[in-house]
């Protein structure tokens, strides 16, 4: 898991007709955010609206993981990271009202429910 905490929003349709493309995990500000698997930092910044400070990791076989709403980013584009490595400090940047990590797993461009994959971690 990228962080240990309480899942406050699950993958899938929301009551407001939008779709959560990941899960949201409530954690205290400053909690270490860990890479779910080894990979390369494809993006580390705050330009994507709503996500706040965001990290995208590219993994083997076209998999990508996303970690959003971070207080502080500890890696930069091109860095190689190991599974379990600290990549950020959790926060409440972007469009959220409480400290949390928004975590996505994608196969190529397609978002998939992270929970079945996290059971293996």
Annotate each predicted stretch with a short phrase.
Residues 1-51:
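Surface-exposed, glycine-biased beta-strand/turn segments
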Residues 7, 39, 57, 84, ...:
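Terminal peptide-recognition signature
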Residues 10, 44-45, 70-73, 90-93:
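Residue-level recognition of beta-strand microenvironments
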Residues 12-14, 28-30, 38, 46-47, ...:
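Solvent-exposed coil/turn segments that connect beta secondary-structure elements
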Residues 22-26, 53-59, 102-104:
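Short, acidic/hydrophobic/Gly-rich beta-strand patch recurrent on exposed beta strands
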Residues 32-41, 75-90:
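Short, well-structured beta-strand-loop connectors
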Residues 44, 60-84:
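Short histidine-centered loop motifs in beta-beta connectors
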Residues 79-121:
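Conserved, short, structured surface segments that act as functional micro-motifs
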């Amino acid at each position: 898991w990228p962080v240990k905490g309480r899942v406050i929003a699950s993958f899938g349709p929301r009551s407001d007709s939008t779709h959560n493309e990941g899960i949201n995990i409530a954690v205290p500000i400053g909690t270490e955010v860990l890479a779910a698997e080894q990979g390369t930092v494809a993006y580390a910044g705050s330009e994507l609206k709503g996500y706040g400070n965001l990290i995208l990791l590219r993994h083997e076989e076209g998999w990508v993981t996303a970690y959003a709403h971070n207080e502080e980013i500890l890696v930069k584009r091109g860095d190689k990271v190991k599974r379990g490595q600290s990549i950020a400090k959790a926060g409440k940047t972007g469009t959220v009202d409480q400290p949390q990590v928004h975590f996505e797993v994608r196969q190529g461009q397609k978002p998939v429910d992270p929970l079945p994959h996290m059971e293996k971690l």
